[in-house]
Amino acid sequence: MEKRFIVTIGREFGTGGRKIATELAQMLGVQLYDRQLLEPIREEYNLTQAQVDQIKSVKPSWWYENVSQDLYEEEEKLVRELAEKESCVILGRTGFHIFRDDERAFKVFLMAERAFRRDKVALRLAIDEAGADKLIDKVDEARENFTKTFSGKSRYDARNYDLVLNVTGLEPTEVARFIAECVERRIKGK
């Protein structure tokens, strides 16, 4: 692909989004950017990982509110700079919002049936189904809260995306291949 592009991937917890994004980036021959983006920013603000987790959590304490906004703005700036330099896949980070007006962006949201997600989470983390359900609720709530706080939008609104894909019963490689084909068609069409 000659033209520069950006693929953003939002996802429900337990859909295999990280694996799908990793495989997609490999198929497209581009870099994947995800939560590791925060590492240099975390160091700059002299924050521990626990503090970053608190900032990103469902109910951050008042002390973190200003740091949280600064952290998000730094992260957004870094994501934009990286996307200006090269084609890439961005996992999470409210990418759909950051690149909402960018014609180079192909915005994807991955969802799946609850039982599929529960089984994946329980297997991956070696926990029972009840524990998996609680974790799914907690992570999805935290992601939705973060998204609404910084974008003013719900990540579940299909209008934010070019493609919303139910991955229930699909292998990550199949999903990544399908998204890659969509991206290639979009790029060639422009």
Predicted region positions:
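Short, amphipathic alpha-helical "lid/cap" segments that border enzyme active or binding sites
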Residues: 76, 172-180
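Small-molecule kinase domains that catalyze NTP-dependent phosphoryl transfer to phosphate-bearing small molecules
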Residues: 52, 66, 128-173
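ATP-dependent small-molecule kinase phosphotransfer cores
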Residues: 36-87, 94, 127
